[in-house]
Design a protein with these regions (language model features):
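Conserved, structured core segments of small domains
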Residues: 1-118
Length: 118
């Protein structure tokens, strides 16, 4: 099994006005996702939701600035690291990832021993 990162990009503004019931539906969707990954034969290795971009600090060329690097309607909201058989399997898992206000990006995690032979 190989590792893949599922990056969840969503519109923060939609979460700012969400009701408690809306939040519960998001939590329920992620719980169902966890079960679905196992049912597909994958494994969630880790993952977290991220705080709003207003809490981000960026460093570029040694210069520290508040906020993310670029202005965008969608921001990185969270991520999962999953183990999947191959990219097709990871994409199948990625399609199930809850992102009601955006979408996801699936990327292979670089295998450190293989890094020298990129």
């Amino acid at each position: 099994m190989s590792k893949y990162m599922i990056l969840i990009h969503e519109r923060e503004a939609d979460y700012a006005t969400m009701t408690p019931e809306g939040w519960q539906s998001v939590v329920d969707a992620h719980s169902a996702f966890t079960k679905a990954v196992a049912d597909l034969g994958g494994t969630i290795v880790g993952g977290e939701a991220l705080q709003q971009t207003t809490t981000a600090t960026s460093i570029r060329s040694g210069e520290v600035t508040d906020g993310p690097f670029v202005e965008s309607k969608e921001a990185l909201a969270g991520f999962y690291i999953v183990e999947a058989r191959d990219l097709d399997h990871a994409l199948e898992i990625g399609k199930l990832t809850p992102a009601p206000f955006g979408g996801v990006e699936v990327r292979p995690v670089l295998d450190a021993p293989a890094a020298g032979g990129r």
